[in-house]
Amino acid sequence: MSIVNSIRAQIPPVHPEGYPFIGGFALVTLLFFWLWSPLGWIALVLTIWCALFFRNPVRVTPVRDDLVVSPADGRISMVTPVVPPAELGLGDKPLLRISIFMSVFNCHVNRAPVGGRIEKIVYTPGKFINAELDKASEDNERNAMVISTPSGQIGVVQIAGLIARRIVSFVRVGQTLATGERFGLIRFGSRLDVFLPEGSKALVSVGQTAIAGETVLADFRQGDGGRTYRAD
């Protein structure tokens, strides 16, 4: 393998959602270089950052019924039982919620935490307060999805934040997702909440780093037998 191919293999592809933003940054960079080169170098750094933000890397997902993987890259910010948002239709009893906060430096492509059928998608307009705050789950703009699995229904909520002002969904009601399949993204910093069925136990802790499609958040089955992996 040539050096060029080796370098290329280490650079993740960019998601098409990022093309307009990267193109805009690139044009501004050229303009700034023409006006004053120091500004051009600053703009070039921002262009590279934008490309990294929209990176769309291949992930190796553990595949087995009853596994729940992280839907987002980021930091586990909350692991606590709370009453799920009404729009999910998951009842009024507290369910285990695992929240993943994505900074502007994380990959923001979101992946299905479980394989199953999408029963519901509900978009709710709202505010843009700090996504790390607990009340952001009620006050902020969000897109909620319910996935039906043999182990029960899983709620997934994309929550916009201070900088994130655009939630993008690639899926529709009735569609069947595979574990780790890409289903959307949130631009420029945000949060993902996963609501697990009653009786679930988390396998992650607050402060832990999560990798979308790879980090196992919960396992409804005792033991670890029968797990396989899929790259996507």
From Swiss-Prot:
HAMAP family: PS_decarb_PSD_A
Entry similarity comment: Belongs to the phosphatidylserine decarboxylase family. PSD-A subfamily.
Keywords tagged on the record: Cell membrane, Decarboxylase, Lipid biosynthesis, Lipid metabolism, Lyase, Membrane, Phospholipid biosynthesis, Phospholipid metabolism, Pyruvate, Zymogen
Transmembrane segments: none
Species lineage: Bacteria, Pseudomonadati, Pseudomonadota, Alphaproteobacteria, Hyphomicrobiales
Catalytic activities: a 1,2-diacyl-sn-glycero-3-phospho-L-serine + H(+) = a 1,2-diacyl-sn-glycero-3-phosphoethanolamine + CO2
Protein name per its UniProtKB record: Phosphatidylserine decarboxylase proenzyme
Quaternary organization: Heterodimer of a large membrane-associated beta subunit and a small pyruvoyl-containing alpha subunit.
Enzyme Commission code(s) on record: 4.1.1.65
Pathway annotation from the record: Phospholipid metabolism; phosphatidylethanolamine biosynthesis; phosphatidylethanolamine from CDP-diacylglycerol: step 2/2
Free-text remark on how the cofactor is bound: Binds 1 pyruvoyl group covalently per subunit.
